[in-house]
Design a protein with these regions (language model features):
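S-adenosylmethionine/decaboxylated-SAM
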Residues: 1-107
Length: 107
């Protein structure tokens, strides 16, 4: 397992290269702008790679009614274009949603 910590706003080409040319990737978006992180890097995922983002709920109303997690910073409406354009499907969300994470896998 290789772990890389990068400033995502200064290293897009370097991070893209790690995703494209590396093995299976689990990309965790948990910085100050999760929407930008998700939308920037999801396009580089390979088949069966996984992307997750924290402080997530499918919608504001879902979050208000369930409050599994105290903070909401990213919801489906923020990433729907990336989900559709990059062929992402939900993956193990029954588990991850409880902890405020979305989880998508590239088909």
């Amino acid at each position: 397992i290789n772990v890389h910590y990068k400033d995502i706003f200064k290293s897009e080409s370097e991070i893209a290269d790690l995703i494209i040319n590396g093995g299976k990737t689990l990309l965790l978006c948990d910085n100050g702008n999760k929407i930008l992180e998700f939308n920037t890097y999801s396009k580089y995922l390979k088949s069966n790679d996984v992307i997750m983002a924290h402080d997530y709920s499918p919608s504001n109303s879902f979050w208000e009614n369930n409050k599994h997690w105290p903070v909401l910073e990213i919801e489906d409406k923020d990433i729907i274009d990336s989900i559709n354009n990059n062929e992402l499907i939900t993956y193990q969300n029954d588990f991850t949603l409880t902890y405020g994470w979305c989880c998508f896998k590239k088909i």
